[in-house]
């Protein structure tokens, strides 16, 4: 068995090196710049509009809005800022609770922490690794009630439960129909952490557009990048106008006066970053096609092994942001991580579960059996587009 696993590990290394046609270090996900990035950056520098006012910021918002078919897209400095603003606009405040998943990147929880809110960790479902509707329904039935005003409250503490925040893990859409039904039943706001899922669709609708708010990320390791950046997607026109206002320091428009009508955030994306984003959006469909081809190759490679490649759920079309595979046991996972990284091929474990981090160790949580199993068995594979 050990010999067989070692053989698979070496075959995987060879497969990945052949795929990327290099003997150099292979990162997990690198950006590709093969279009108008340099030209648009030069244009921005020549214009002197390098901060949050400039034509590329507006153009980037339009491109993302049209691609996702959302009501309004508001560009922010990063995905965490988009989440933070979404929580603020949803009325989440100090002492409130937000239901989310423990299997996520820490930014999900950091955003609600900085609102003064606390996470409630519920298990993932074992197919797409997003927030499980059944586990969420069970937790709510056991621990929540609606008060006379229709506010969802935690029975033991009386704290208001304000929102449900699923994350579309590795780009695979969560089960949104069921989660939306729970939000309606319990008077919760659905905020989609779509940081990883630009180009992913749930039953034909882009992720981040089914909830009241959605948040995208354009970090350097995402499907497209602005260097650093995010986008707050709003379905409602009034929400969109409020999002633009509060992320622009709540400044009231005026030709020369500086007047701010509420505490706001300095979260607007700079024009330099948006210039990158506009160029990247021009190649988004090519990038997505390349990533789906890569995922198909990985699926074919692992088909005859004891490792299970994670495919998109039947109800969705995934961007396959980070390809992932489940190892047969913890020992094989650890060996795979050690061997591949020692030989210059970056394979990484999934994030440590949020309730294991010191700042969230005391958070309320349900049974996290699927999350803990995934943590012990799942690894991510190099996922840079190969033909973009």
Model regions and ranges:
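Helix C-cap/helix->beta junction micro-motif
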Residues: 115, 185-186, 343
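Generic structural signal for small/hydrophobic residues in well-ordered secondary structure
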Residues: 41, 64, 82, 98, ...
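Phosphate-binding glycine-rich loop
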Residues: 50-97, 103, 111-114, 121-123, ...
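N-terminal "arm"/small-domain region of PLP-dependent enzymes with the aminotransferase-like
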Residues: 1-50, 381-382
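Short beta-strand->loop structural element characteristic of the AMP-binding/adenylate-forming
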Residues: 118-128, 348
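PLP-dependent aminotransferase class I/II
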Residues: 15-16, 56-62, 70-71, 145-159, ...
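Active-site phosphate-binding strand-loop segment of PLP-dependent enzymes
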Residues: 127-226, 231-233, 238, 380
